[in-house]
């Protein structure tokens, strides 16, 4: 009888140890699962569906198209197709005008998708509204030494502005869902209107395009990083800017056709 009690007691102890071991394993699994969920290990949005790095839905397609048009403008400037290059600059501006609106229609965007949209838009902007205007001015002012200084300042200021904007926009979106009410400094996309205007002023006045192009590029670049608050245009302001752009675009198209 005593032996039976001892055996039974030993079996109870073993069962208790097994249950405790199972409990510890379950706790470890729960902890590991919580850590994986927090770090999002093995389940990143960038690896879903396509298997490729990046995002390829409709929210970023217009940004990709704008970048391609901007690069085409760079190639045209190198080939001395200056008017065609300016047309590409303005078309890239149109793409940039609507890509944010299109992206906002996707209400279920993940945090990664929103962050990617900000980054890819800025990278596209530096090509379209930084490199393209700089290459255009370099090609039309090859013999003016100030052009090199203007080009360097313009690209550097544009790059700094876009990097700062990315940081500021990420902080703003984390704090509020409201739309931006003002810009700090001149938006880099302003070159889509300013550079064609410089060309047209040179074409229809006695001022040489080579003289004003480098100076305008230098001034625009400095304005990119000036800590001046510029309120976003009202509806009237937007219509006015679109109207100015439409006039510039039509004149450039007419020059190509004629």
Positions of the model-derived regions?
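Transmembrane alpha-helical segments that form the membrane-embedded catalytic/substrate-channel core
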Residues: 96, 155-168, 218-231
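C-terminal membrane-associated helical module and adjoining short loops/tails
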Residues: 18-19, 27-44, 173-258
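Cytosolic, membrane-interface loops and tails of multi-pass inner-membrane proteins
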Residues: 38-50, 98-115, 164-181
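Basic, amphipathic juxtamembrane/active-site segments
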Residues: 100-144
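Membrane-embedded alpha-helical segments that form the functional core of polytopic membrane enzymes
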Residues: 61-119, 150-155, 216
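Single conserved hydrophobic/aromatic residue that forms the stacking wall/gate
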Residues: 1-15
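Membrane-interface loop-to-helix entry segments
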Residues: 62-64, 121-126, 182-193
């Amino acid at each position: 009888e005593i032996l039976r009690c001892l055996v039974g007691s030993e079996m109870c102890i073993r069962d208790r140890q097994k249950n405790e071991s199972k409990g510890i394993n379950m706790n470890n699994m729960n902890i590991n699962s919580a850590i994986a969920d927090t770090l999002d290990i093995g389940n990143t949005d960038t690896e879903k569906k396509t298997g490729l790095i990046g995002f390829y839905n409709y929210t970023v397609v217009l940004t990709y198209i704008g970048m391609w048009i901007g690069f085409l403008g760079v190639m045209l400037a190198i080939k001395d197709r200056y008017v065609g290059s300016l047309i590409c600059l303005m078309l890239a501006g149109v793409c940039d005008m609507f890509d944010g609106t299109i992206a906002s229609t996707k209400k279920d965007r993940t945090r990664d998708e929103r962050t990617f949209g900000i980054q890819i838009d800025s990278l596209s902007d530096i090509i379209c509204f930084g490199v393209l205007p700089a290459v255009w001015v370099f090609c039309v002012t090859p013999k003016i030494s100030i052009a090199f200084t203007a080009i360097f300042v313009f690209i550097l200021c544009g790059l700094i502005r876009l990097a700062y904007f990315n940081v500021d926009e990420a902080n703003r979106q984390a704090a509020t869902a409201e739309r931006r009410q003002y810009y700090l400094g001149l938006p880099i996309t302003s070159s889509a209107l300013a550079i064609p205007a410089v060309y047209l002023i040179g074409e229809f006045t006695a001022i040489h395009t080579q003289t004003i192009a480098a100076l305008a590029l230098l001034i625009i670049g400095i304005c990119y990083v000036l800590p001046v608050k510029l309120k976003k245009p009202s509806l009237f302001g937007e219509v006015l800017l679109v109207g100015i752009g439409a006039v510039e675009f039509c004149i450039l198209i007419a020059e190509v056709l004629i």
